Amino acid sequence: MPLRVGTGIPGGGQRWWGRWHKSDVGGVVLNIKSEQHLALEFDRMMQIPEASAIMVQPMLKGTELFIGAKYEEKFGHVVLCGLGGIFVEVLKDISSGLAPLSYEEAYSMIHSLRAYKIIKGTRGQKGVNEDKFAEIIVRLSTLLRFATEIKEMDINPLLATEKQVIAVDARIRIEKK
């Protein structure tokens, strides 16, 4: 089975909201198909400054989604969603809502995206499981109600198919009072 390999860089290898990402420094490799290739990439990635570990995952396919959150002093936690991967930075098509969110609010966030046709499925491509996507948004917003020390969170990408939505990478910034 093809593999995905990523570095374990403190802070997720990304300065918040896309100034640089671990993929920008060669910290992500897709479709590793042999032990030799894996060993070469491991050695190379461990030379990346601040790299402390390597994560090896099965190579999954699906539509890349994004869910994030940011604590705003005046409002509390703002939950964000949209297409993930590079699309969140390039398209800047993000929907937001204040935690805690209901399922109705989560669906409204999803449906308000300009890229909703991609999520729904278009031009012969199957859509993603909106129920699972909405459920993750609601559960994240509920978590934030109780985990007030979370100041920023980024789950990107989530890989979504018509059956499932799986988190591939995540980053959380915590501040204790």
Where are the regions a protein language model picked out?
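ATP-dependent carboxylate/acyl-activation modules
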Residues: 1-177
